[in-house]
A protein has these predicted regions:
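Helix-start (N-cap) detector for alpha-helical repeat units in TPR-like alpha-solenoids
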Residues: 51-53, 86-87, 118-121, 153-154, ...
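N-terminal leader/linker segments that initiate helical-solenoid repeat arrays
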Residues: 17-76, 80-84, 97-100, 107, ...
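Terminal, low-structured helical/coil segments at or just beyond the last alpha-helical repeat
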Residues: 286-295, 300, 307, 349-385
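Structural marker of alpha-solenoid helical repeat scaffolds
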Residues: 47, 81, 114-116, 148, ...
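Register position in tetratricopeptide repeats
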Residues: 30-31, 64-65, 98-99, 131-132, ...
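Canonical tetratricopeptide repeat
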Residues: 57, 91-94, 124, 158-161, ...
């Protein structure tokens, strides 16, 4: 009897220690000390075996710390061990979404929804379809999510983005009006309604939305850009110039803003419009690095075509290269050589003549061009052309 009592007390003490250890792990997690929590859990599993509650804590540590691969392995195992626990499947869905495995996220999400219509799951399935640009399916799930939780700004914003893309402005206005009637200061939905109002040419109403955002402390590019657009549409050109300049101060990457400011200043017969056109033209200049890389790509393509006897492709690629690098004069005699190999001696002669003046006397390029001209003239003489 004493032995049995001792065993019971022993196991109770082990259970108590395990509970204390688990409490300590959870405290570490609350302090975002996930590495320490994982180390403790690993030691506990070595001593106690892979108990489900330990595996769950370990999976959560990996999930919270962003270690998606380990979290995916752990939650896959847990979902097999406890198939009725939806939390594990929700985490799997989230991990697949994080990893851009959208089909897998959709499949798991649909399985969850057969058991429970969870708003967040509906939304995430919609997000997965949206990432795949399957807008109709995304719209359906967003609408289902809103049917269960109508006042959801995140889902409403995503649904309205789809509707704006289809120019369904009236429906966007109906949805956003209803939302803003309850929450008029919402900085997520106000700009959505403002854009829809602007698209419907309700410029005063659109201006009111963006001004309200500004009054609420929103002072970003989009606010001033649309205030500028509204002012311009209403003929308030000074106001438009001011707002577009404020937009430019916040984001100087939109060449159309620079062009608009230049036009507004010019139309007002004021000084300084040239500066804004210069800004715009500078922005419109292609990136020299991109030009160089593109020219090199066409040159390499041409050389490969030449080596493989595809002279038509070689000619086409050298001509494209000259669009990006017109001073690459060697391309002229390379094109000439291709036409020569195609026995199109007249065209070859023209290209050798084009190449000749670009090379100085005594240079290798000049020699290639001049001997090429001599050969082509001889060929044409024998052909009586």
């Amino acid at each position: 009897m004493r032995c049995r009592v001792s065993l019971i007390l022993f196991f109770l003490s082990l259970a108590s220690l395990a509970a204390q250890d688990l409490t300590a792990v959870r405290e570490l997690k609350q302090l975002w000390k996930y590495d320490e929590a994982i180390a403790s859990l690993t030691q506990m599993m070595a001593a106690q075996g892979p108990r489900p509650e330990l595996l769950e804590e370990l999976a959560d540590c990996h999930y919270q710390s962003g270690n998606s691969a380990e979290a995916l392995d752990q939650y896959t195992l847990l979902a097999r061990m406890q198939p009725d626990k939806l939390l594990f499947r929700i985490r799997l869905m989230s991990l697949f979404y994080r990893g851009k495995q959208y089909d897998a996220a959709i499949d798991i999400g649909r399985g969850i929804l057969q058991r429970d219509s969870i708003t967040q799951v509906l939304s995430l399935v919609g997000d997965a379809f949206n990432q795949q640009e399957r807008r109709d399916s995304a719209e359906w799930y967003y609408r289902q999510a809103l049917a269960r939780r109508p006042h959801n700004e995140s889902v409403l914003n995503k649904l309205c983005s789809i509707l704006l893309g289809r120019e369904q402005h009236d429906e966007v206005l109906a949805l956003t009006d209803a939302f803003l009637a309850e929450e008029p200061d919402n900085l997520t939905i106000l700009p959505v309604r403002g854009i829809a109002r602007f698209a419907k040419k309700r410029y005063d109403d659109a201006e009111a939305d963006f001004k309200h955002m500004n009054e609420l402390g929103e002072n970003g590019y989009a606010v001033h850009y649309y205030l500028g657009q509204c002012a311009q549409k209403n003929g308030l050109l000074r106001d438009a110039e001011r707002e577009f300049k404020l937009a430019w101060q916040r984001d100087s990457t939109d060449v159309n803003v620079a062009l608009t400011i230049a036009q507004l200043i010019s139309d007002a017969r004021k000084d300084g419009w040239e500066v804004w056109y210069d800004k715009a033209l500078t922005m419109l200049q292609p990136d020299p690095k991109v030009i160089s890389a593109t020219a090199t790509a066409h040159q390499n393509y041409a050389l490969s075509a030449y080596k493989n006897g595809d002279f038509d492709r070689c000619i086409a690629e050298y001509k494209k290269m000259l669009e990006y690098s017109p001073k690459h004069y060697a391309a002229y005699y390379m094109i000439a050589q291709c036409y020569e190999l195609k026995q199109d001696f007249k065209t070859a002669l023209n290209w050798y003549k084009k190449a000749q003046p670009y090379f100085s006397e005594g240079s290798r390029g000049r020699e290639i061009a001049e001997t090429g001209i001599q050969r082509m003239e001889a060929e044409l003489f024998f052909l009586n052309e």
